[in-house]
């Protein structure tokens, strides 16, 4: 047997073994989808040649699963075809397993298709926008203002000069300990993280440009250096303006970090947004009106969901604290969730009645262990430990608090394999295309089992040998 054929058979054997392992993992995760619900993630992205794709992933408390990618270039502006695509996804996952469908597409076509899909299934789940994408939209609005755009332009001049030349990069390593450029795949999150780091590094940058190593270099006499040095050393107007911008953007970026560090982000999103607004108000000395208005516009128009209000109430750390406010938005959110999510998994009327027990802190909710563990264990675990006497409410709470607020952005996934799958489809036989689909399925799921999502881009451990 020739060596080439042996290699081909060996690769096929490895692929089939990894395919079996991935299928087994999917079966296990599907059981969790039925028990505690899941979030379907529709990650919309474009190829370098401008074609539109959607990758379908499913999140649950046991992990993230990649199902498939779809070329939607010909249907992205067709509501009927978008709706058919969404219906196929929902039927595959199971409508009553889904708590929410998270998208990063705010187009009117997708919004209309969402409406028809919810109507088709009688609203057993919610559509929400990825929290990362929403904050990125908000930061984009901030960046578009004239004063801020001028600050960002000068900041970019500094970072471009440093990162484009060997000597500044070498000296930066000596004088500035932290990396200045952010690697976040969220464009405007990265822009404002970079600006904050630049503001923090100013003193060290001044020292760098005043160093003997710099003064003796060929760069010291260049016109470009004099320009950059002038900004760093003496342009106090720029640095004050940059510091003022950071007072607005830091609370919003910090909110995303806060969500990242909590095992149950659904339970803290509502509170985290309120805290970010209060931080902006405090930072600006009360001159926050325009920023609050923009935040509220994005929140109300894109991000806010009854799920976030319900998660806020069902988080005992917040609900039993002095800062909890039972307003109309919270009341409406918990009522809508109680009814819509309870079609199969619990009885809405019983859950509503049991909510009074939770509200009044009666029964097991008033026990010493329940009080002690409010801050000691994750919210879902708290409900498992102390909600057994209110089983319908417990089921609802666990289904809501088990969900994420994010899409796939934090995994920083390279979708190039999916692009190759679709671009070359017409040149393959049906068997070859099936094999390529298996490679895609194994490749991305192997990646997801080893990747840790984070705001700066996924940290990845291990070699990805599939595909």
Predicted region positions:
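Short alpha-helical patches at protein termini and domain edges
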Residues: 1-467
């Amino acid at each position: 047997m020739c060596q080439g054929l042996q290699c081909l058979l060996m690769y096929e054997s490895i692929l089939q073994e990894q395919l079996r392992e991935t299928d087994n993992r999917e079966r296990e995760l599907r059981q969790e989808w039925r028990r505690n619900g899941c979030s379907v993630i529709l990650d919309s992205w474009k190829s370098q040649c401008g074609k539109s794709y959607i990758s379908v992933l499913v999140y649950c408390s046991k992990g993230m699963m990649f199902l498939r990618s779809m070329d939607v270039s010909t249907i992205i502006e067709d509501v009927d075809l978008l709706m058919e695509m969404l219906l196929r996804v929902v039927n595959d996952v199971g409508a009553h397993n889904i708590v929410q469908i998270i998208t990063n597409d705010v187009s009117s076509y997708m919004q209309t298709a969402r409406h028809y899909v919810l109507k088709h299934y009688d609203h057993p789940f919610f559509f929400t926008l990825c929290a990362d994408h929403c904050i990125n939209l908000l930061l984009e609005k901030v960046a578009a203002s004239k004063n801020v755009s001028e600050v960002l332009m000068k900041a970019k001049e500094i970072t471009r000069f440093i990162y484009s030349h060997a000597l500044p990069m070498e000296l930066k390593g000596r004088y500035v300990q932290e990396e200045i450029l952010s690697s976040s795949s969220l464009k405007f999150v990265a822009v404002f993280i970079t600006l904050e780091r630049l503001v923090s590094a100013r003193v060290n940058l001044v020292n760098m440009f005043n160093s003997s190593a710099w003064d003796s270099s060929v760069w010291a006499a260049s016109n470009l250096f004099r320009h950059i040095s002038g900004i760093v050393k003496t342009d106090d107007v720029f640095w004050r303006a940059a510091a003022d911008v950071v007072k607005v953007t830091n609370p919003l970026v910090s909110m995303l970090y806060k969500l990242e560090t909590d095992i149950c982000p659904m339970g803290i999103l509502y509170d985290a947004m309120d805290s970010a607004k209060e931080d902006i108000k405090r930072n600006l000395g009360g001159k926050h009106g325009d920023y609050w208005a923009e935040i509220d516009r994005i929140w109300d128009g894109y991000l806010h969901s009854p799920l976030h209000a319900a998660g806020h109430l069902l988080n005992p750390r917040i609900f039993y604290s002095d800062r909890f406010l039972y307003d109309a938005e919270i009341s409406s959110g918990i009522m809508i969730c109680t009814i819509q999510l309870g079609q199969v998994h619990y009885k809405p009327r019983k859950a509503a009645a049991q909510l009074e027990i939770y509200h009044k802190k009666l029964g097991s909710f008033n026990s010493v262990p329940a009080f002690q563990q409010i801050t000691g264990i994750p919210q879902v675990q708290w409900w498992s430990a102390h909600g057994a006497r209110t089983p319908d409410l417990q089921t609802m709470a666990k289904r809501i608090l088990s969900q994420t607020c994010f899409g796939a952005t934090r995994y920083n996934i390279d979708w190039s394999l999916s692009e190759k799958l679709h671009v070359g489809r017409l040149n393959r036989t049906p068997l070859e295309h099936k094999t390529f689909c298996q490679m895609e399925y194994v490749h991305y799921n192997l990646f997801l089992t080893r990747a840790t999502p984070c705001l700066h881009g996924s940290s990845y451990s291990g070699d990805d040998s599939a595909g």
